[in-house]
């Protein structure tokens, strides 16, 4: 079953972000390694002191942005799915509360435990597993950068119940082992997870274990597909390139914890003579056009899953977390 503890804490992180308990980790092969400054040498992505500074720098910028409802204040510290989801949230917040979020309580992250993979080439990354002042879950951040001159940016932010944090495979020096995008030793290659999830949501199957974000989501869509005067259609697709590439770390059982990103659309179409009413201020803030007959909403979602080793018992991928956020809306 999917494990989805931790939702309440992350709902505080984003008013219209959908969240659950999440996990740690990441990775993917870098392409085009250049033989300069040791890019072909296998090295830790960062020293612990560097990781600590990166966490502090992100937290300072993040709290400023949340307080002011201004995405420009942490734009240099976020990327990938987090930039998409949280950036849209801040954009909506700025329109609904241009003076800022007066009720915002600064996020505090303590007891940081870093999972730092050793690899050659760029991009590089590491994971920070932290305690927060929001709840009892572990808040997990994935830091990435594309070169030695870049600032560390957070591409994933999610939460995981302490008991759900997986054990990572490490070498004798304590460095984690990254998995590649095309790792054939896993039940599903990381680069295929986004497409596999999109296919599953449309057609079902046995690629993913039952749970809230798999069988539960399909059941909910089926129930809401057609109601008196209103029909809903869904489209799902992977996001695999650049800062949205899947990332994973090997676990001690030979599987991996993998993060991946997907893109989702929901279109609501009203019957003739029926009006579409939009009450959510965040949807209104991000919406273009007038929803006279239809409303199309666009979401970005990042998932954290356990991808089992190929041939090791149950081959279904298990969800640990899903964080989704509205990024755009269009009325027609």
UniProtKB/Swiss-Prot annotation:
Keywords: Cell membrane, Lipoprotein, Membrane, Palmitate, Signal. It is found in: Cell membrane. GO terms for cellular component: plasma membrane. It comes from the Bacteria. Residues 1-32 form the signal peptide. Its main location: membrane. A lipid is attached at residue 33 (S-diacylglycerol cysteine). The keyword Membrane applies. It is a lipid-anchor. A lipid is attached at residue 33 (N-palmitoyl cysteine). This is Uncharacterized lipoprotein SAV_5923. It comes from Streptomyces avermitilis (strain ATCC 31267 / DSM 46492 / JCM 5070 / NBRC 14893 / NCIMB 12804 / NRRL 8165 / MA-4680).
């Amino acid at each position: 079953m999917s494990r989805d503890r931790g939702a309440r804490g992350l709902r505080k992180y984003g008013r219209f972000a959908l969240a659950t308990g999440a996990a740690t980790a990441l990775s993917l092969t870098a392409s085009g390694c250049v033989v300069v400054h040791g890019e072909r040498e296998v090295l830790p992505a960062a020293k612990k002191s560097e990781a600590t500074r990166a966490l502090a720098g992100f937290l300072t910028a993040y709290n400023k942005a949340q307080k002011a409802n201004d995405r420009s204040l942490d734009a240099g510290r976020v990327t990938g799915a987090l930039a998409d989801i949280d950036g849209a949230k801040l954009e909506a917040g700025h329109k609904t509360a241009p003076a800022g979020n007066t009720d915002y309580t600064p996020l505090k992250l303590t007891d940081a435990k870093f999972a730092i993979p050793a690899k050659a080439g760029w991009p590089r990354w590491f994971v920070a597993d932290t305690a927060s002042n929001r709840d009892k879950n572990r808040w997990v951040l994935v830091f990435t950068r594309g070169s030695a001159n870049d600032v560390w940016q957070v591409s994933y932010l999610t939460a995981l119940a302490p008991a759900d944090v997986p054990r990572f495979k490490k070498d004798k020096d304590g460095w984690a082992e990254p998995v590649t995008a095309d790792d054939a030793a896993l039940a599903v290659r990381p680069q295929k997870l986004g497409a596999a999830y999109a296919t599953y949501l449309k057609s079902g199957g046995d690629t993913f274990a039952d749970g809230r974000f798999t069988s539960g989501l399909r059941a909910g869509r089926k129930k809401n597909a057609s109601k008196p005067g209103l029909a809903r259609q869904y489209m799902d697709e992977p996001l695999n390139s650049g800062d949205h590439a899947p990332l994973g770390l090997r676990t001690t059982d030979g599987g991996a914890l993998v993060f991946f990103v997907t893109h989702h659309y929901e279109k609501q179409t009203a019957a003739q003579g029926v009006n579409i009413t939009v009450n959510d201020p965040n949807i209104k803030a991000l919406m273009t056009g007038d929803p006279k007959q239809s409303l199309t909403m666009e979401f970005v979602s990042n998932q954290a899953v356990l991808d089992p080793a190929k041939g090791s018992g149950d081959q279904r991928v298990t969800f640990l977390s899903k964080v989704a956020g509205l990024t755009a809306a269009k009325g027609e």
